[in-house]
Amino acid sequence: QRSEILLMALTGNQGKSGGGLRVAAWWELDGQRALWGGGSGPAWMTATEKLGLLYKAKIGGGLSWREFENLAVKSKEYRGGIPLMSFLYAHGGYKEIWDSPAFHDPALPRPTAAYMKEAVDKGWIPVRPLPGIDPKVYYFTGMNPLRRWPAPQIAQKHLWPKLAMIASVNTKLSTSSLMGDIVLPAAGWYERDLIKYTEAYIPYVVLNGKVVEPLGESKSEWEISGLLAKKIQERARARGVTTVRDAAMKGEVDLPPAYDKWTRDGKYRETDPRAALDEILLNSKLTGNKGYDEAAKTGVLPVVHAEGGPAPLWALGTRYRQGRTVFPHERFVLEKEAWPTYSGRQQFLIDHPWFEEAGEALPVHKEPPKAGGDHPLLLTGGHTRWSIHAIWRDSSLMLRLQRGEPVAYVSVKDARERNVADGDRIRVFSDVGEFEVMAKVGFSVRPGQVIVYHAWEPYQFKGWKGQQEPVAAPFKPLHMAGDYGQIHYRGIYSGPGHHPRAQRVNFARAGSV
């Protein structure tokens, strides 16, 4: 991405319609701040800091991008959220594969463990729970970690036994739900009222209207969270529990009034989300302060006004008005606002010690590391065209449009060398794991490549060993660097991630050695 952005800068394709690199950005519904009555600032701020924040918001024209980033970086010390990779490294047992130097960039002069220790010691990357304290409860909504995480067998071996409770909120029995303890069935599409998504690829906020009642015992996530808050309050009062330490171990959470706070002292009810949705929309300048009933008439609200200032999910930096296309970074390029970088400009030289010792102070091409072992083929993927995501990947109707089961696309040359014909079952393997799948020999597949499209559930494979089993996907240690302008971690920004592309594998006919 650094190289792509450099190319755009060199060709003058930043800050104008049709230009710029945008991976993901969301319209900020400013009314969400009013939902819980956020007050004058986060609880961890001093009175002086809260006063300064209030002045900036009301009189000083708002925070600059750099001021916002500085505040967001500081807030990570007080929040429970952390990057997934540091959690799996510390608590999931992934050290056993990610510490292997053979799986990483050979230019790195130090092992992953050394980078992790320095990043944690310097406060660049948080680890929650703190090292030495095992996680006890894993509660996830809509997620499917045993399908998405690299080498999920590692998590099942090391993380799952530590957990006293695994609870899933889901619309279907995903692999992860089936491998958990409790499934709270969630209402499906058109069985609940909600704001569906606010991604800034289109100039609209999209809603989802309830037209039928939820099936069986399923409930909306709104109702589920409200009922959990009610039960937590009930049990805390019955047991005489007052406060508990928060996830960051920096503050306390008051449990006896949990439900009262959730409902804003009765303002909202878990059985009716419309009051909350109405408050969000009525307080959102973004969509013209129109309420939910008006929005529900068409199912969408046009975006009418966006200043493009800093916000947790906002990554465009462009003032939007109706009739314009949506594109990023106008405020930095045309209005000359300082970029939130070390230099205040578009910056491609990163003279951070970690980047320098890895030979990446400037954008540079490197071949994919031999993650998974020294094998001759690269496992890649793509976005499935048949099911959109895992939610419909096991639909009998969708499966009729293809082979009816998971398939791996392999080249004619690689198949011939391994005595594999179209439709044969093959074993795709690395040093980390393996899975069995049907081979689909394709003339358009490049030799040296194995393609498995995403979203297959592990339970659709033999022995529940899915396509992620041989994927080591070690994170890049440089992504834990901090204390250098734009190079830092905070919620929904930067941090180490797994990239399960170009992973080293081989394949053979199933049953062969």
Regions of interest found by a model, annotated:
Residues T175-L207:
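Flexible glycine/proline-rich, aromatic-decorated loop/lid segments
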Residues A25, T141-G142, V169-T171, A186-G188, ...:
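Active-site proximal loops enriched in glycine and acidic residues that flank catalytic Cys/His/Asp
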Residues Q1, P152, H158, K162, ...:
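Accessory structured domains or lobes within enzymes
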Residues I5-L178, K297, P302-R418:
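Extended redox/cofactor-interaction regions of prokaryotic respiratory oxidoreductases
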Residues E221-N289, A390, S395-Y409, K413-V513:
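Long, contiguous, secondary-structure-rich segments that constitute the structural scaffold
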Residues M8-G18, A187, E191, A229-A236:
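Structural signal for hydrophobic packing residues in well-ordered secondary-structure cores
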Residues Q1, R128, P145, W149, ...:
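Hydrophobic alpha-helical scaffolding
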